């Protein structure tokens, strides 16, 4: 069985730039400041399912 992955979507433009492995121990959604190549800036990315 493979690892289920979830996307990290940019809050500015909405593009899904990063994918991370899902962790069952984490109940809240992940939020990270990452670089968005579409916006050209560092922006907050939120976990989508």
Curated annotation (Swiss-Prot):
It comes from the Bacteria. GO terms for cellular component: cytoplasm; ribonucleoprotein complex; ribosome. It holds the Pfam family Ribosomal_L33. Keywords: Ribonucleoprotein, Ribosomal protein. One of its GO terms (biological process) is translation. InterPro entries: Ribosomal_bL33, Ribosomal_bL33_sf, Ribosomal_zn-bd. SUPFAM superfamilies: Zn-binding ribosomal proteins. One of its GO terms (molecular function) is structural constituent of ribosome. NCBIfam families: PRK00504.1, rpmG_bact. Belongs to the bacterial ribosomal protein bL33 family. HAMAP family: Ribosomal_bL33. This is Large ribosomal subunit protein bL33B. The lineage of its organism: Bacteria, Bacillati, Bacillota, Bacilli, Lactobacillales. The gene is rpmG2.
């Amino acid at each position: 069985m493979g690892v289920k992955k979830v996307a990290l979507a940019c809050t500015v433009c909405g593009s899904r730039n990063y994918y991370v492995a899902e962790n069952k121990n984490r109940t809240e959604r992940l939020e990270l400041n990452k670089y968005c190549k579409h916006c050209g800036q560092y922006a907050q990315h939120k976990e989508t399912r």
